[in-house]
UniProtKB/Swiss-Prot annotation:
Belongs to the glycosyl hydrolase 3 family. Its main location: secreted. InterPro entries: BXL, Fn3-like, Glyco_hydro_3_C, Glyco_hydro_3_C_sf, Glyco_hydro_3_N, Glyco_hydro_3_N_sf, Glycoside_hydrolase_SF, Ig-like_fold. This is Exo-1,4-beta-xylosidase bxlB. The lineage of its organism: Eukaryota, Fungi, Dikarya, Ascomycota, Pezizomycotina. Xylan 1,4-beta-xylosidase involved in the hydrolysis of xylan, a major structural heterogeneous polysaccharide found in plant biomass representing the second most abundant polysaccharide in the biosphere, after cellulose. Active against rye arabinoxylan and xylohexaose, but not paranitrophenyl-beta-xyloside. The gene is bxlB. It is an enzyme of class 3 (hydrolase). It holds the Pfam family Glyco_hydro_3. It catalyses: Hydrolysis of (1->4)-beta-D-xylans, to remove successive D-xylose residues from the non-reducing termini. Optimum pH is 4.4.
Length: 763
């Protein structure tokens, strides 16, 4: 190891200085690289990549296995930073840089994924991703970014305490799967052989803990049953591989059933590449940042750096976000822990993806290479960001028509969020052109505005209460802007409580005693327990806005004033605050059991507000096109290479706006089959959804909801994915007053998939 570090010191010393911007595209015209087949566009991407890898020395190969790949000055291969982020817009992270002012000093900052998830609008997801990838390519063309992006995060948001739940679309695996299909499709484009950018599905697998009870994500061993893997943790990742053909995956920090994810050949090879067929020549796996190192230093799965590097490479990791592969693969090779063939295969996958992206091709003839500053933060993008903020807003309470607000008058804006800007963005964000505060948004609408924060997000001081109560007494209506921000929830920071932090709730309830119309706008990715506010007659309305980002002020006030009608739905369950005392975060089981009351709407019944909840400024009547559908033949539904994607039927609803306000309506369709499959059975399962746009008062709209086989299946502990014949009940929305419908699947039990088990699966 000492010998390896000495001959590689010069490269390593420059390799890991934080990059300010990306290197230029390779010179395939006049430079030394132009003499190599990598620049020959008549060859296949795989052939071109293999030719480059074969031209590299062992030292050069090893020094291109980290995220800050050194390239080869000898060959004219520029350095490349693989670590680029674009969770909800081009983000200021490592491989991405922003100017201090002028061109490329900002990008469109869309609302956080949890807000986009609350919109339940697949077309909206794709359009957002398309704009993000356009801006990403513009940044790349100006040497401010790369052309691969480590997004999306599709770990289902199972535990309300998880600090990174804000990065996900929500808790339901079908919802996450549909999100990722559209988001990856929007980022990469429609041609898998020539992607717009490379997307990266993360974090494989069973990752939803930062630090809890003295256990951190770096050493946590997630004990997960085969049933929960197949029904909950893996479906979004399977969609990434099978349906979306994502370009890259990221393995997670945690171990899965005893094996660190980035050292788990079963997970990365047997499941991902072989069982799911994710074997494209340009498909690659990166470790999460520092995850390869932590195979040794936190999991103690191996004893040395070379062993950790070898374990990752041999498991199927192609790239290290960190230093362990470039630091230790040389010694691993000398010890016989890796083969040159395995190293070459990893690099070939990486460079094949760059060839497919046009990285080595002339700019002429590549429309994407002409994108520039004029294509960033366009008026269309800004309007779309506002649309997402509006469509993802969820109305949780509205008594006596507290909302929409009356025009004009005096508003008292109270709460810690009234003057926030970047705090509205969530994490993994880049600079936005402008983020108006709630105060600014209200003043633009012509209101007379009185302001007093009253308290801070997590403060127990009541020093500001008197000022808040004083302005409230002078106002026509009160709006409290509060909730949680990234000082309470974020990467590396899980919550220990899920009630309102600090004394925000105390202040809200004091305001509620004044007899003025009071609206509470709740920010944050995770939910807080609103029980006291829902029960208070003095709290007229509650609105969840999540992290609405650059258009948050305008979008929120469009909803508050009635310019836009709320129609978003909670993409996660709102649990009572006592829930955190009932189940440890380290318990990965979904089903109820000892010290576990059950997780998500499928298994938990005592929610404060359920998954899918959301009110409107109008009323709707919903009925089924018919009371019974089908029957459907089980064997027919089980046909094909990927039967889980087969369509069962398109179920039609008649949705009538019986109120006075035009409004969108999200039709959520659940199925229940309590007698079928292993017991206990889920309470219900989301099987489809569709968002209808602007249904006018008095209008009846036909809303079609397509249902595939996947959400109807159940898994067994021996790894079978099964479709059971029998009767299924369809439920719409979370309104028990809406009628149900039924359908029947006839025939024999069908095994759709035989999932390979590792031998380490949790019982």
């Amino acid at each position: 190891m000492a010998v390896f570090k000495s001959w590689n010191l010069a490269l390593l010393s420059s390799l890991f200085i934080p990059a300010l911007c990306q290197s230029n595209y390779p010179d395939c015209t006049t430079g030394p690289l132009s003499e190599l087949p990598i620049c020959d566009t008549s060859l296949s991407p795989l052939e071109r990549a293999k030719s480059l890898v074969s031209a590299l020395t062992l030292e050069e190969k090893i020094n291109n296995t980290g995220h800050e790949a050194a390239g080869s000055s000898r060959l004219g291969l520029p350095a490349y930073n693989w670590w680029n982020e674009a969770l909800h817009g081009v983000a200021e992270k490592h491989g991405v840089s922003f100017e201090e002012s002028g061109d490329f000093s900002y990008a469109t900052s869309f609302p956080a994924p949890i807000v986009l998830g609350a919109a339940f609008n697949d077309a909206l997801i794709r359009r957002v991703a398309e704009i993000i990838s356009t801006e990403a390519r513009a940044f790349s063309n100006s040497d401010h970014a790369g052309i691969d992006y480590w997004t999306p995060n599709v770990n289902p948001f199972k535990d309300p305490r998880w600090g990174r739940g804000q990065e996900t679309p929500g808790e339901d695996p079908l919802h996450c799967s549909r999100y990722v299909k559209e988001f990856v499709g929007g980022l990469q484009g429609d041609d898998p052989e020539k992607p717009k950018v490379v997307a990266t599905c993360k974090h494989l697998a069973a990752y939803d803990l930062e630090e809890w009870g003295g256990v951190s994500r770096f050493e946590f061993d997630a004990k997960v049953s085969a049933v929960d893997l197949l029904e909950y943790y893996l479906p979004p990742f399977k969609t990434c591989a099978v349906d979306a053909s994502v370009g890259a995956f990221m393995c997670s920090y945690n171990a899965l059933n005893g094996v660190p994810a980035c050292a788990d050949r079963y997970l990365l090879q047997t499941v991902l590449r072989e069982h799911w067929g994710w074997e494209g020549p340009g498909h690659w796996v990166t470790g999460d940042c520092g995850a390869v190192e932590r195979i040794q230093t936190y999991h103690h799965y191996v004893e040395s750096g070379p062993e950790a590097a070898a374990a990752a490479l041999n498991a199927g990791v192609d790239l290290d976000c960190g230093t362990w592969l470039p630091s230790y693969l040389g010694e691993a090779e000398r010890q016989g822990l890796i083969s040159n063939e395995t190293l070459d295969a990893a690099l070939t996958r990486l460079y094949t993806s760059l060839v497919q992206l046009g990285y080595f091709d002339p700019a002429e003839g590549q429309p994407l290479r002409s994108l520039g500053w004029d294509d960033v933060a366009t008026s269309e993008a800004e309007e779309l960001a506002k649309t997402v903020a509006i469509q993802g807003t969820v109305l949780l309470k509205n008594i006596d028509w507290t909302l929409p607000l009356k025009a004009n008058g005096t508003l008292a804006l109270i709460g810690p969020f009234i003057n926030f800007t970047t705090e509205l963005q969530s994490n993994y964000a880049g600079p936005a052109k402008h983020i108006p505060t709630m105060i600014e948004a209200a003043e633009r609408l012509g209101y007379n505005v009185l302001t007093a924060p009253g308290t801070e997000v997590n403060s127990t001081s009541t020093d500001g209460f008197d000022d808040a109560l004083a302005i409230a007494a002078e106002a026509d209506a009160l709006i409290f802007f509060g909730g949680i921000d990234n000082t309470v929830e974020e990467e590396s920071l899980d919550r220990t409580r899920i009630d309102w932090p600090g004394n925000q709730e105390e202040l809200i309830l004091e305001l509620a005693e004044l007899g003025r119309p009071l609206t509470v706008v709740q920010f944050g990715g995770g939910q807080v327990d609103d029980s006291a506010l829902l029960a208070s007659a003095g709290v007229g309305a509650i609105v969840w806005a999540g992290y609405p980002s650059q258009a948050g002020g305008a979008g929120v006030f469009d909803v508050l004033t009635g310019k836009a009608a709320p129609a978003g739905r909670l993409p996660i369950t709102q649990y009572p605050k006592s829930y955190v005392d009932e189940v440890p975060m380290t318990d990965m089981n979904l089903q109820p059991g000892t010290d576990n009351p059950g997780r998500t709407y499928r298994w938990y019944e005592d929610a404060v507000l359920p998954f899918g909840f959301g009110l409107h400024y109008t009323t709707f009547n919903v009925s089924w096109a018919k009371k019974a559908f089908g029957p459907y033949d089980a064997a027919t539904l089980a046909r094909g290479k990927n039967p889980s994607s087969n369509i069962v039927d398109t179920f039609s609803l008649a949705v009538t706006n019986t109120g006075d306000v035009a409004s969108d309506y999200v039709a959520l369709v659940f199925a229940s089959a309590p007698e079928l499959g292993a017991q206990p059975a889920p309470i219900k399962t989301l099987v489809g959804y569709s968002r209808a746009s602007l249904i006018k008062p008095g209008e009846t709209r036909k809303v079609d909801v397509e249902v595939t086989v996947a959400p109807l299946t159940r898994a067994t502990e021996d790894g079978r994915v099964v479709l059971y014949p029998g009767e299924y009940t369809l439920l719409v929305d979370v309104n028990d007053e809406y009628p149900t419908a039924k359908f029947e699947i006839k025939g024999d039990v069908q095994v759709l998939e035989k999932f390979p088990l590792s031998g380490n699966d949790s019982d």
